[in-house]
Amino acid sequence: MYSAHCMLPELRLYQLISPSLPVGGFTYSQGLEWAIDKGWVTTATELENWLKSQMLESLTCLELPVLVRIQGYLAANDYAQAQAWCNYLAASRETKELRLEEHQRGIAFVRLLPKLGIALTSELTTMVKTSQLAAFALGINQWQIPLDKALGGYLWSWLENAVVVGIKLVPLGQSAGQQLLMSLAENIPAAVEKALLITDQEVGSFTPAQVMASCRHEHQYTRLFRS
């Protein structure tokens, strides 16, 4: 039997991953702007390879498993462990630019979450400022979003923002961007499945080209995206 109540968590997820969410996700390129400027990424195929590598070697092995742990510890009211994983995520950001993005988006969530009905204690505020993933985890718990759907939604949100960067800078046409989304999104189900199986000892990322590009982007003379 159809139930509007059952649909509400999914609708809340759509809101949480929307590009219109005022937390600045669309203002960062995570090094991609420099990679495009220096000719590392010049075609739709090269962009697809770049994003696929980042998705499978970073988000699947670092962000998603950390999000799973933060969500679980917050649900259990174990704030110490949740904060520890926020700290781990922040420490895993290998450039100043990536650390600032994590912190700045966290601050934006601190302003936003109370307006969406999520109360923040001083402990939770510190957590969210450390890592935006804490804000996402709070949303998952508050709105009872199924974890696998939340992980897929998080990946989709990142992917959509990254493809928009490519559309603007490579540049690519809008249709080519949609084709990229169609192709790359096919990796999301397997990525979520893998992320849910990763042990604590396996959590980490390895994307040296992206890290180098992010370092260089901090000093790029002309930029459209924040550093």
From Swiss-Prot:
Name the Gene Ontology molecular function terms of this record: nickel cation binding
Stored InterPro entries: UreF, UreF_sf
Q: Which domain of life is it from?
A: Bacteria
What are the entry keywords? Chaperone, Cytoplasm, Nickel insertion
Q: Name any GO cellular component annotation.
A: cytoplasm
A Pfam family this protein belongs to? UreF
Localized where? Cytoplasm
Q: Does the keyword Chaperone apply?
A: yes
The family database entries (PANTHER family) matched by this protein are listed as: UREASE ACCESSORY PROTEIN F
In the record, the note on similarity to other proteins reads: Belongs to the UreF family.
Q: What does this protein do?
A: Required for maturation of urease via the functional incorporation of the urease nickel metallocenter.
HAMAP family under this entry? UreF
Q: How does it assemble?
A: UreD, UreF and UreG form a complex that acts as a GTP-hydrolysis-dependent molecular chaperone, activating the urease apoprotein by helping to assemble the nickel containing metallocenter of UreC. The UreE protein probably delivers the nickel.
Annotated protein name in UniProt: Urease accessory protein UreF
Organism in which the protein naturally occurs: Shewanella halifaxensis (strain HAW-EB4)
The encoding gene is ureF
